[in-house]
């Protein structure tokens, strides 16, 4: 009886090639597993395709809501952003996908896991660190690090030589990754940073800014302890909430990012990301958080968020440090509750009002009039003490100058 292997299967070019390649080079029965984190219609017909390509079994694991509640909401609460732009769409999904692969492998009695991540990319790190954390004795097979195929054109020829249907056209070979949170695009004209992306051809979730409506749209979000609970007064499941925001955000060209990023392995790459719903959630969360958190907590939370972002991006989700940082973030979110109103207009998100029962904004303190809580004369003593180190330093310099010291 052959040993079993679980393959992270998307039905795209890479994993379509991997099934026959594994059969030719390894003595395993291949179980193709698609983890549904919001790919939509991309999962249609995958079972037939996988079996026809040589898999002995196909499994579809649906986990959209789990993806949002356990992986997306933590990064929303942290407002985790890689290199000032990237909202971790692929980074947050990979640990969950790898976790589900391990679970299926254990159920099926498999002893190995294979993936289609390239030897130059981040995903190989994310997949394999997760497997090592959850199933340290599993064998991991990464065909891109073993075979002599070096391009997408060679992959296409490999399939054509074996009379296997190619799941893409040669003239439309963007490398895309779609989930509930975002859609990424790489390849073609994007490989040269001098080129402007062909947005008319590229975008799938969003309008171009030129094609976005000429009238803006208001959207109101409600948060409880940092987690979105309602949009425009309506309650949604976690996945449906993101889908709804994707729809209205995409309509108004919100969340389109062109990023030159530094991969974990040290290579610079370029990608265009569409994250319409996520961009709205980050903007709304930021508004209410600035209303409800004090300066010291807010500033230190930025430090924690930066480190958390690094852990998530580099595949270190299942680590004690990531859990500890998320626990800190959660502790800061106990008062991040209230309503935020935003206006969406041609790629812009414009704050239009925020309220919270835990607001730290005091109108009488913020106004120019003198109130009971604050006397303008109090500022003199504060400035004297706050500026004392500056004064002492200046006096020292004057004294040194008089003494002829430099």
From Swiss-Prot:
EC number, as in UniProt: 6.3.4.5
Assigned protein family: Belongs to the argininosuccinate synthase family. Type 1 subfamily.
Binding site for L-aspartate: 118, 122-123
Recorded coiled-coil stretches: none
Positions of L-citrulline binding: 86, 91, 122, 126, 175, 184, 261, 273
Keywords in alphabetical order: Amino-acid biosynthesis, Arginine biosynthesis, ATP-binding, Cytoplasm, Ligase, Nucleotide-binding
Locations listed in the record: Cytoplasm
Name of the protein described by the UniProt record: Argininosuccinate synthase
Pathway: Amino-acid biosynthesis; L-arginine biosynthesis; L-arginine from L-ornithine and carbamoyl phosphate: step 2/3
GO cellular component: cytoplasm
Gene this protein is translated from: argG
Pfam families: Arginosuc_syn_C (PF20979), Arginosuc_synth (PF00764)
SUPFAM superfamilies: Adenine nucleotide alpha hydrolases-like, Argininosuccinate synthetase, C-terminal domain
Lineage of source species: Bacteria, Pseudomonadati, Spirochaetota, Spirochaetia, Brachyspirales
Residues annotated as binding ATP: 8-16, 116
